[in-house]
Amino acid sequence: IMLAMNSPELEILGITTVQGNVPVERGFSNATYLVEQLGKDIPVHTGKPGTYSQDRNEKRKWLGQREEMEQLTPILPVDNDKKGAPAFIAETAKENSGDIELVTIGPLTNIAQALDLDPELPTHINKITMMAGASTVQGNVTPAAEFNVWADPESAARVFGSGIPIRMVPLDVCHKTRFGREQLNLIGENEHPFCQFVQKSVDPWLKINPNKEIIDQGLHLYDSLAVALSFM
């Protein structure tokens, strides 16, 4: 999100949050915090807890719910968001028909629900650039499943079958990248508040990750690759 908001190549019309690595309330709070701290006038709308057709909460792993990361931003109430993410997507796409690109870095629940609200949505969206899936490598939840698709496969099927042009950044690409301690330390040396936020956010993942390879070699990049591809 910070990469997108700091990129002059993009005009961000809005951000929607979805239940993925963290609960929907945490995602809403994190996104709202970033928008406010950057001084941007960008609406943030929250999706509903759960998935497109059923609630898979018991099967999910909250990869981001670590004590260190929970302390970075307060949990904000989502009750004031009367419109909600699906309606915002449907209305904004119609108002800007043909000029809209969606960049997704989580499950596709909000878009699937937006398709239900407006069956003509595919005619309004230019394309979707998404971090999702795996082609020639194993998944990161099961041998066959990448997390963003696994977390809500029904919504993924709905979106992939919608006819909207899709550019996918799969695990095959993500696993060719690394962001490790050396890069994080360079960012942490900068006193800018957002450099400090990145340092505090990523440090727990490198410090207490059960995967020794990640501690030694660094994290793979995922969502930022989809944002970067949207420049093109």
Set out the residue ranges of the language-model regions.
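N-terminal acidic, glycine/proline-rich low-complexity segments
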Residues: 1-232
